Structure formats: C-alpha cells, structure tokens
C-alpha cells in the first residue's frame, strides 16, 4: 500500500489519541507553514513509502494547534515544526525537528521502531 494511502490527517487531540491507539507503532509528522516543511517531508516520504507496516499521522500545526500541543503535553516533548516523532508500542522513542529531519535521522528512527 503506497504511503499516500497510509496517511491520516489529525486535527484534534481526540484524533491523535485514536490514531495512536489504533497504531501504537507509527510515525507523526508535525507540518508547519515554512519552507522547511516540504524540504524535510521529502526525507519522510522517501523512507516511509517502502515501510508498508507503518502509518503516518500528519498534524498541520497552524490549522490544528490543539492537536500539536496535545502531543507535546502527552509525551513531554517540546512543540516544534516541522517535527517527526516515531512511536513504538505507544511510546515516543525517537524525534527530530527542523533541519535535523534528514535521511540519516529517518534511518535511525526506523531502526529504533524496528528493534
């Protein structure tokens, strides 16, 4: 199944909770409105497309700030955008933000969720 068919757009705290309950091992991408978002999403797409076992939740932080803040509060991580967060068994196990979202970081995150 291609990545585009495994993406859920999350707009509320309840949707975030539902996504993570249904997909305890998954990835969240918090998308901002600056030029970094599309540039970093290239790495996300390239590394998640072949991983048919992983679903991707996307939070557009400008439109859905409560959902983004919920993730930060729930998992004790600072809100950033763009930001990639890997979950394994319902726990945040790896995250990167801004220009630290690279191919190397994606490989590292995938290694952590696959261990």
Can you name each region flagged by the protein language model?
Residues 8, 57, 93-94:
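Structural signal for short hydrophobic segments within the conserved structured cores
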Residues 29-30, 53-70:
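Thiol-based oxidoreductase modules, predominantly thioredoxin-like and allied folds used
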Residues 39-41, 67, 98:
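Residues at alpha-helix caps and immediate loop-helix transition turns in enzyme cores, especially N-
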Residues 43, 70-71:
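A short acidic, amphipathic alpha-helical/loop segment
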Residues 74-78:
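Short loop/turn motifs at secondary-structure junctions and domain boundaries
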Residues 80, 85-115:
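Non-catalytic, surface beta->alpha helical segment in thiol-disulfide oxidoreductase systems
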Residues 1-24, 114-115:
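N-terminal leader/targeting and pre-domain segments
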Residues 15-50:
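Local sequence-structure signature of Cys/Sec-based thiol-disulfide redox active-site neighborhoods
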């Amino acid at each position: 199944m291609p990545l585009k068919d495994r993406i859920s757009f999350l707009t509320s705290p309840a949707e975030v909770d539902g996504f993570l309950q249904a997909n305890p091992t998954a990835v969240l991408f918090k998308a901002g409105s600056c030029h970094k978002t599309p540039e970093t999403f290239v790495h996300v797409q390239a590394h998640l497309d072949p991983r048919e076992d992983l679903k991707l939740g996307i939070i557009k932080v400008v439109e859905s700030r409560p959902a983004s803040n919920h993730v930060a509060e729930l998992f004790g991580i600072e809100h950033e955008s763009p930001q990639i967060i890997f979950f394994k068994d319902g726990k945040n196990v790896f995250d990167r933000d801004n220009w630290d979202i690279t191919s190397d970081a994606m490989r590292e995150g995938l290694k952590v969720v696959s261990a």
